[in-house]
Amino acid sequence: MSWSEKTARVWRFLRQVWHLSLPYFNSAEKWKARGLLAAIVALNLGAVYMLVQINEWNRVFYDALQQKNATVFWAQLGRFTWLAMIFIVIAVYRFYLTQLLQVRWRAWMTRDLMHRWLTHDAFYRMELARYIGPAEESTTEAGLPQPGQRVPDNPDQRLQEDVNIFTSQTVGLSMGFLNAVVTLLSFVGILWGLSGSFSFSLGGSSFTIPGFMVWMAVLYCTVGSVLTHYIGRPLIGLNFEQQRREANFRHHLVRVREYSEAIALDKGQTVEEHNLDTRFASVLANYLQLIGKQKQLVGFTNLFGQAAVVFPFIVAAPRFFSGAIQLGELMQISSAFDRVQGALSWFVDNYDSLASWRATTERLTSFEAALSRQNQAPAGLERAQTATTSGASDTLTANGLTLQLPTGATLLEDAALSVAPGEHTLLQGPSGSGKSTLFRALAGIWPWAKGDVALPANVMFIPQRPYFPDGSLRDALAYPEPASRYSDAELKQALEDALLPGLAARLDERDNWTQKLSGGELQRLAIARVLLKQPAWVLADEATSALDVPAEEALYQRLKALTERAGGAMVSIAHRPSVAAFHQRHWRLKRLPGEQGPLYTLT
């Protein structure tokens, strides 16, 4: 890779960091954020100033020791006491304010990304888009995926872990870099003045190098930085891959817990153990590569650091033994060299953190870019919702409705449908014909759709797999509204009407209801939610498929009565003949012949 390409890559990374950081410092919290940042910068400058004072103290103190001057010795101990106290206060508040900025930034950024993830159905669209990306990602030379190639996986990791790493490392590394620059500028002049000149003869000519110790520090750190980058460069891609494999392993563990009953009934423990072991072996394999590279990096950085302890003494020793400098100046040279070398070695000392920072920034950048794409107004379905709530004019209509699969195949083309109040309609068709996809398009969440849809205002959807949050039963029943909106009598009546009288006494019991209840109980709980909220329109997708016929008929009778009282209608997807009795109209998705054009037509 050429130097210009490397430079372009560094600038691209810095632009990514700037793009991710700027929104917080321009947000509603901007003055607090900027104030904290300014205070941290001021404390860093104060810390460097105190180090300069301590460096000067070194010269006076050690000269007093060499000269056996007790008066100066005790005076300098007193001076050191207040220098140390001021430095400690600065260090404590620098740590506190840095942590405060990190946690405030993390809180804001997490909430911002979480809001964008849950807005405009972005979380749903991103999950759908995961299944249509390329099978493999091409990677950069550092082992990172090319940006924008496919939707990032594991959004939970991005929100919970990556935001925390990014904010802490951005603050920590940027302030560390600032501290290194200021330290270098403050001590390079001191070291230049103390180091004197180095004279030598070559080819009959005499040469003098002023500020010899400064040039030795630059040479020492340049060699160290180049070798560190050469040794540690693979850590960038390995860190990225480690986080991905850890998240995949964690995700599969959660799935085993969620589907524990089904796995136990299928006797699938051996298969799941093998799958988990395979994923964990992948985690370990990458981790072994990671620690192998870290071992090399740690070995070199420790060698580099230990050599730096004696290096200034070796270089300055001839001047000390010749009497050109005193012990105090030698110690001041050592201290100044240590500060200059430490500043110039910032890259060496932080290489592992820089690799992790870059990998985290790449992951968050891809996640943020995916959110931006998903939160843009979709170019497909235009969904208009009426302002009315009930009445004879309240209808469900769709015109010019075209549905596509993620693969690009067309399910329906230019379909039109209309349902008036009281026209209970049953949608049927073979499995995989797009019945649920049509419901998703009517709800406005299917991204591969075109057309105009008008929904009544007071409508509820019952999906095949209803969602119930962990927590109290009353919260699960009232979701997404607050349970306080409904009285205990209303909640209990809804449960009894949905044939769940046994749950009426458990409203305040907290549990994972999706795992606690059977499939039939979950379907009845979803219907109880509808009976509680009393919408005028109900669109049900296989809402009673796990129930026996008598229970199914009883619940459909109640749903039908509910919608008729409110001046609406039911639209259902179902296969059983018993459900057909509750619907006056029938829609059917029929397969069309041929490979070209839409796969189905709606009749």
How does the language model describe each region?
Residues 466-512:
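Conserved "ABC signature" C-loop
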